Amino acid sequence: MKYLIGIDDHDSYKFGCTTHFSVILTSYLYKNHNTILLDLPYLVRLNPNIPWKTRGNASIKLIVDFNGTKKELADIIFSYSVKYVKNVSLALEHGRRPGIAIIEYDKYKSLFEKLYDFYIKGILDIIPIDYAKKFAEKNDIEIRGDRGIIGSIAALGMSGDYTYELITYRKKENWLKKRMINEDSVKRVDEETFPLTFANYDYINDSPLITPHGNDPILYGIRGTSIEHLIKAMELIESNEDINFFAVFKTNQNTDIHFQKVGNRFYQEIKKVIQIKNIKILEGGDVMIRTTDDDILFVYKETGELNSAAKLLKEGDEIVAYGAIKPSITYGKIIELERFEILKLNDLQLINPKCPICGGPTKSLGKNKGYKCKKCKYIINTANKSMKNIIRNLSLGIYQTRAYRHLTRPIFLTLENNNQSFHEERKFLDMYRSELYKLDYHL
């Protein structure tokens, strides 16, 4: 029978990774329970703003054929899950609460809208564990575990635009060693495969973007829209250690799914047309923007080009603000921007009148007190300020941080999951199944 499996919360801040678990689980099910993977695994990013998430807040969806009941499959998977979090990720020691969710494929089709709504809620909002358990009970979803149930159910509902990520995994003896990736080979990947792969190298800070920084099992991950070019990229990248195994995931990364539905509560995303009241460049380079609606927006120095553009905004400019709503001890509520689109630029500036005697510049003596010439000191009592057109070093359009988050869609990216993508996936899946059978991993 055909089933959908959701998996979450198998990593920790020290070791392990939910994607890593999903690959060795798929191999284990294939070799020991004749369970066939029917589609590429799905890497599902959820709410990026939740404070207690690990790294990328990702869950996994698998579609498999299993000769048994939903309960039997859940028992097999959760037993393997417990071994992984005890022996590999040490997740329980670090406050993780793994979970799984399973539903029959036929039932999934009839519950599609409900599951999709749960998925979107998992991206936009914070879902209580009790809500997830009641949802599972009401819709006959088999669950095991604890908090990871939330992300597992959300993963079941993933649908819509997707990209791919190819992830390579390290041998266990290398997990505590520094990753040594030849940077020139990563640049070569960019030269030969961009834009079908992307986010490979940061040319501003001169460092690769494909490597994580923790002790997790991942060597590197490459994002793209073509499996063929992801494989080519992997073949081009040079490292001082051998790859243990790799997988290609379908993923909602880089699709802007987090802006499909927005809100106005803490840890939700916001997309809002605002008019700028004033900006302030803070010590250190962060930009604080106040709006005519009394919203407070922050554009942090680390956002690079976005921060530079924000410094050039002024009163009267109109933008669409994209960002996350966060609590602030100082301001109560702030919006952290990851992108803005300039709709209207205020290209007018109020200027003091010229001196009628010598033509020199003047300075204000205070409200309704007139102006004083800076050169000849003549006092003007009746003149008013005038408007002057100014040149702005900005243009209408979208400005975005170069260090975009997992879900953020790059400006250049076109998403076209077409028949060519389908044929690529089928071809790769056949090869991937045989690799899964060869994989020898013992917990």
UniProtKB/Swiss-Prot annotation:
<dbReference type="GO" id="GO:0002101">
    <property type="term" value="P:tRNA wobble cytosine modification"/>
</dbReference>
<keyword id="KW-0436">Ligase</keyword>
<dbReference type="Pfam" id="PF08489">
    <property type="entry name" value="TiaS_FLD"/>
</dbReference>
<dbReference type="InterPro" id="IPR055394">
    <property type="entry name" value="Zn_ribbon_TiaS"/>
</dbReference>
<keyword id="KW-0547">Nucleotide-binding</keyword>
<dbReference type="InterPro" id="IPR013696">
    <property type="entry name" value="TiaS_FLD"/>
</dbReference>
<dbReference type="Pfam" id="PF23783">
    <property type="entry name" value="Zn_ribbon_TiaS"/>
</dbReference>
<dbReference type="InterPro" id="IPR024913">
    <property type="entry name" value="tRNA_Ile2__agm2C_synt"/>
</dbReference>
<dbReference type="InterPro" id="IPR053870">
    <property type="entry name" value="TiaS-like_TCKD"/>
</dbReference>
<keyword id="KW-0963">Cytoplasm</keyword>
<dbReference type="GO" id="GO:0005524">
    <property type="term" value="F:ATP binding"/>
</dbReference>
<protein>
    <recommendedName>
        <fullName>tRNA(Ile2) 2-agmatinylcytidine synthetase TiaS</fullName>
        <ecNumber>6.3.4.22</ecNumber>
    </recommendedName>
</protein>
<dbReference type="GO" id="GO:0005737">
    <property type="term" value="C:cytoplasm"/>
</dbReference>
<comment type="function">
    <text>ATP-dependent agmatine transferase that catalyzes the formation of 2-agmatinylcytidine (agm2C) at the wobble position (C34) of tRNA(Ile2), converting the codon specificity from AUG to AUA.</text>
</comment>
<keyword id="KW-0819">tRNA processing</keyword>
<dbReference type="GO" id="GO:0016879">
    <property type="term" value="F:ligase activity, forming carbon-nitrogen bonds"/>
</dbReference>
<comment type="similarity">
    <text>Belongs to the TiaS family.</text>
</comment>
<keyword id="KW-0067">ATP-binding</keyword>
<dbReference type="Pfam" id="PF22641">
    <property type="entry name" value="TiaS_TCKD"/>
</dbReference>
